[in-house]
Regions:
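Macrodomain-like recognition of ADP-ribose-binding/processing modules
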Residues: 2-297
């Protein structure tokens, strides 16, 4: 919110400077055209001062509202650009990106998941034994939106397994030793699996957390940074310069317990330190309804 105010002040200052300059030029032109206009100035100085104050008050309100509207309407902030490569922070909803106007580039949308790539969603803890994926996480919302039936969830499991086999990913021996009762293989933090629930959507499932034997998620800032670097490496090798969209990770129900602002700064810093992997447009997505809690400026 503080940065939104700072941006508002910046826009406001620029508008003030422009309008004052314009008024100065206009006054000079009027004085040049009508040289006798100020001969009787002393006679009505009070009235002129009063009118001048009213004009500046009105001008202030106009500039303020224009600045406020400009701040509200601006949805993105490009923080780095070099040729056709860029890093941008945007206000948006990642689940609405695929349905927007199509362009020549694909959109690769990141979904943070666990190292087992679980697909069992917890909607009712009284009915689900050892619930895994919360419906309130991006992981859970993704599954419920695109794989709402048991047959579709089974198809998702198959798609994940086939992709893991295709890429030759091997189970993480350290995790397998740590959690010996795992019902599924566990893969390294930062493992990326691409799935395509519809013809016009491309999602990258990014492993950022581990589930223990009781299905409690465990993660950390170190896991987050490691997974982000792995994601950027994957993007560089596999996404052919198409657009990448990364949501804020490690907030809400995550065990990392980051604020939106903290998550944004970690993601931003990690990308800025690995720009050699950016060969397209990388977008950090802040949920559009969270404008009041985190600024993109």
């Amino acid at each position: 919110m503080i940065k939104n105010v700072a941006y508002l002040k910046k826009v406001f200052s620029k508008l003030v400077a422009v309008i004052i300059s314009a008024l100065s030029i206009l006054l000079s032109v009027i004085t040049f055209i009508f040289p006798n206009l100020t001969e009787n100035w002393e006679c009505c100085i009070i009235g002129k001062v009063f009118i001048l104050v009213l004009c500046f008050a009105g001008l202030f309100l106009i500039i303020f509202f224009i600045s406020l509207i400009a701040t509200k309407l601006k949805r993105k902030n490009t923080i780095w650009q070099k040729g056709c490569r860029s890093v941008t922070i945007v206000y948006d909803d990642i689940f609405k990106l695929k349905s927007k106007k199509k362009d020549s580039k694909k959109k690769y949308i990141v979904i943070p998941v666990d190292t087992q790539f679980m697909t069992q969603v917890d909607e009712d803890t009284f009915k689900v034994k050892n619930p895994c994926v919360s419906i309130n996480t991006l992981h859970g919302k993704f599954i419920k939106q695109f794989y709402e039936t048991e047959s579709k969830v089974a198809a998702l499991d198959s798609e994940i397994s086939e992709y893991i086999s295709l890429k030759g990913y091997q189970p993480d021996s350290a995790q397998m030793a740590k959690y010996q009762n795992s019902s599924k293989n566990r893969y390294e933090i930062g493992t990326v699996v691409e799935v395509q629930p519809t013809n016009d959507s491309h999602f990258l499932l990014l492993a950022v957390s581990e589930f223990d034997e009781n299905n409690n998620a465990h993660s950390s800032k170190e896991f987050l940074v490691k997974s982000l670097v792995s994601l950027l490496e994957f993007y560089n090798k596999n996404c052919q310069g198409n657009d990448l969209y990364i949501p804020l990770i490690g907030t809400s129900l995550s065990r990392i317990e980051l604020s939106d602002e903290q998550s944004l700064q970690i993601i931003r810093a990690t990308i800025e330190q690995n720009l050699n992997y950016v060969h397209g447009n990388v977008n950090i997505v802040v949920y559009e309804k969270n404008r009041s809690s985190v600024s993109i400026f």
